[in-house]
């Protein structure tokens, strides 16, 4: 998996688990944006991201999934231990407006995390907008993007996949 934090913040050692520390860092740092590039052959991303989402699900705020053209599987959400009553999904949005929708959602501060699936890399201007929105809303933003098929010779890190069983 290749992740890229679009926000810089200091991480101090702690006796807390990594997920608890990450959730607390989000609160103290004012929110962050991270990009996860995934590949269809490696399904481990759910094992990495799910514990953090479970921890964030204990907050009083919502978890928002912006997944154009795909719908989350209700049985998967229940089986994963995520709070069904705190899940919001927008899947009938135009992929061209997904970044704008993510920015607006991050700014509201109503969400612990906003997950967004994008087919392309973000521009520098989009990264700045999302970083500022996440900080203003004190929210985690996760940008999920499939690995591009070209340029594999230059790939430095393996990527991960979100199982299609997440959707029905």
Swiss-Prot record:
It comes from the Bacteria. Induction: By DNA damage, as part of the SOS response. This is Cell division inhibitor SulA. Residues 105-111 are annotated as: FtsZ binding. Residues 161-168 are annotated as: Lon protease binding. Interacts with FtsZ. One of its GO terms (biological process) is division septum assembly. The record marks 168 as: Essential for degradation by Lon protease. Component of the SOS system and an inhibitor of cell division. Accumulation of SulA causes rapid cessation of cell division and the appearance of long, non-septate filaments. In the presence of GTP, binds a polymerization-competent form of FtsZ in a 1:1 ratio, thus inhibiting FtsZ polymerization and therefore preventing it from participating in the assembly of the Z ring. This mechanism prevents the premature segregation of damaged DNA to daughter cells during cell division. Pfam families: SulA. The keyword S-adenosyl-L-methionine does not apply. HAMAP family: SulA (MF_01179). The keyword DNA damage applies. Belongs to the SulA family. Keywords: Cell cycle, Cell division, DNA damage, Septation, SOS response. Is rapidly cleaved and degraded by the Lon protease once DNA damage is repaired. It comes from Pectobacterium carotovorum subsp. carotovorum (strain PC1).
